[in-house]
Amino acid sequence: MIPLSVRVPASTANVGPGFDSVGIALSLYLDVVVKEKADKWQVIHSFEESIPTDDKNLIVSTACKVCPSISPHIIEVTSNIPLTRGLGSSASAIVAGIELANQLGNLNLTADQKVQIATNFEGHPDNVAASILGGTVIGALDGKDISVVRIESKELGVISLIPNEELNTDESRSVLPKMFPFHEAVKASAISNVLVAALCQKRWEVVGEMMERDHFHEPYRLELVPLLPSIRKCAKEFGAYGTALSGAGPSIFILTPYEKRQEIAEQLARVFTDMKVCELEIDHKGIIVNKEEHIGS
């Protein structure tokens, strides 16, 4: 019998100009199955050897920081979220760790509390809030104050183009400017404002237009993801709303009309043969916990 399992969706962040603020949960998943208690933590997985199998694993270390009193267990982790590709793999692990602590420690955390804790770990709310709440989220971190709003976007389809190459988030952030001119900040903020308003009003053509007019980060990251302009051009010709970097890259995130997502994905796959083209959906559920029996700490 499986006593406890946790499923956490992947996420994409930024959606163009919504830098470190806008996130969308996606239909790729990290699954954690909690097995029996043990003398020490053991993580069973089939990932690369660099991923720890003990209490240094990000899921376990997060859980132990949230609730140090929980007993060690054997857990089994599976995931179809690509690592270091801009699809929130580390955020999903952090969220899974928080939920693991919540369940094993009987913490009864609210969704808002989970977002607060996860943001403190991650440093920004976009990926973690999307994975916790599902759907599309807009978040702001101001000192210790975190505000998150969730909206539904069920009319949208999602395509992700995933390259074979990894791109470390720290490397992708290193190309960003340390300072931003005031007039550029005003322009970039205005575009981000219109993106959020269009998402709320379901004006998808405007969403697509604003996605492709970012000034905060994409112009500086083009050297790391040089295919973005050509993918953007093709996607628009094939009927997509808009294209942007997925998080820090290198994956590319495309919003489409829901009914056209398969057709557009097939067309893109014929052009960009060196990339994995994934037809995805927006996950609207967020964290899912299945319990067959109660486990205490």
UniProtKB/Swiss-Prot annotation:
Q: What's the superkingdom here?
A: Bacteria
Chief subcellular location equals cytoplasm
Residues the record lists as binding ATP: P82, L83, T84, R85, G86, L87, G88, S89, S90, A91, S92
Task: Name the Enzyme Commission number(s) assigned to this protein.
Answer: 2.7.1.39
Q: What GO cellular-component annotations does this UniProt entry give?
A: cytoplasm
* GO process annotations (BP): threonine biosynthetic process
Its keywords, alphabetically, are: Amino-acid biosynthesis, ATP-binding, Cytoplasm, Kinase, Nucleotide-binding, Threonine biosynthesis, Transferase
Compartments where found = Cytoplasm
Provide the reaction this enzyme catalyses.
L-homoserine + ATP = O-phospho-L-homoserine + ADP + H(+)
Supply the SUPFAM superfamilies for this chain. GHMP Kinase, C-terminal domain (SSF55060), Ribosomal protein S5 domain 2-like (SSF54211)
Claim: Cytoplasm is one of the keywords in the record: yes
Q: In which pathway does it act?
A: Amino-acid biosynthesis; L-threonine biosynthesis; L-threonine from L-aspartate: step 4/5
Parts of the chain that traverse the membrane:
none
Kindly give the Pfam families that the UniProt entry links to this protein.
GHMP_kinases_C, GHMP_kinases_N
The keyword Cell inner membrane appears for this protein? no
GO molecular function term, any single one: homoserine kinase activity
Explain the purpose of this protein. Answer: Catalyzes the ATP-dependent phosphorylation of L-homoserine to L-homoserine phosphate.
Xref: PANTHER family: HOMOSERINE KINASE, HOMOSERINE/4-DIPHOSPHOCYTIDYL-2-C-METHYL-D-ERYTHRITOL KINASE
| UniProt similarity note | Belongs to the GHMP kinase family. Homoserine kinase subfamily.
Tell me the protein's name: Homoserine kinase
- According to its UniProt entry, this protein's organism is Bacillus cereus (strain ATCC 14579 / DSM 31 / CCUG 7414 / JCM 2152 / NBRC 15305 / NCIMB 9373 / NCTC 2599 / NRRL B-3711)
